[in-house]
């Protein structure tokens, strides 16, 4: 379960097939999550799915599922230095400048018969950013192999031929 704008609950059980499941009320909102239990018993939580925000991580208390400390920015999209994060067929599109975004956004508003001042601020930023050609950083997944940690993620967008996986070791 995940939700933007609303704290999300966790569910746990000792028997995933038959249950019962216990709901643990959430204390934070998240989208596209991954839960990682390290072999030392510490639990970590990773999430993010956006072209405006990073993949975050935080340690969780395994009993309460509450964060221990503050969330940390772990991976931010950077199509200028990681070419596999560039949009477009065959990674052919660079991020747009603010002026180019303004032109695309104005055309979108005109085509929809909308006025910028009538769009709520949270929707305005989200819609406008879709024209930036910035990569969607999503699908965080932590793996440990031979005492090394691999934080994997997907980008730039599932709708094009160059959907890719990146990894930080």
Model features per residue range: what roles?
Residues 1-169:
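Carbohydrate-active catalytic/glycan-binding domains of CAZyme proteins
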């Amino acid at each position: 379960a995940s939700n933007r704008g609303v704290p999300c609950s966790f569910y746990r059980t000792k028997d995933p097939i038959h249950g019962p499941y216990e709901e643990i009320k959430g204390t934070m909102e998240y989208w596209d999550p991954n839960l990682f239990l390290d072999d030392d018993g510490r639990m970590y939580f990773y999430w993010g799915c956006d072209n405006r925000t990073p993949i975050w991580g935080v340690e969780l208390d395994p009993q309460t599922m509450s964060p221990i400390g503050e969330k940390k920015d772990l991976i931010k999209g950077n199509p200028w230095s990681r070419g596999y994060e560039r949009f477009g067929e065959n990674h052919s599109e660079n991020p747009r400048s603010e002026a180019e975004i303004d032109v695309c956004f104005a055309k979108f508003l005109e085509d929809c018969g909308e006025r910028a001042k009538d769009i709520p601020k949270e929707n305005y930023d989200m819609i406008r950013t879709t024209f930036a050609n910035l990569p969607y950083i999503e699908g965080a997944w932590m793996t440990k192999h031979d005492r090394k940690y691999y934080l994997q993620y997907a980008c730039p967008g599932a709708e094009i031929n160059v959907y890719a996986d990146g990894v930080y070791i």
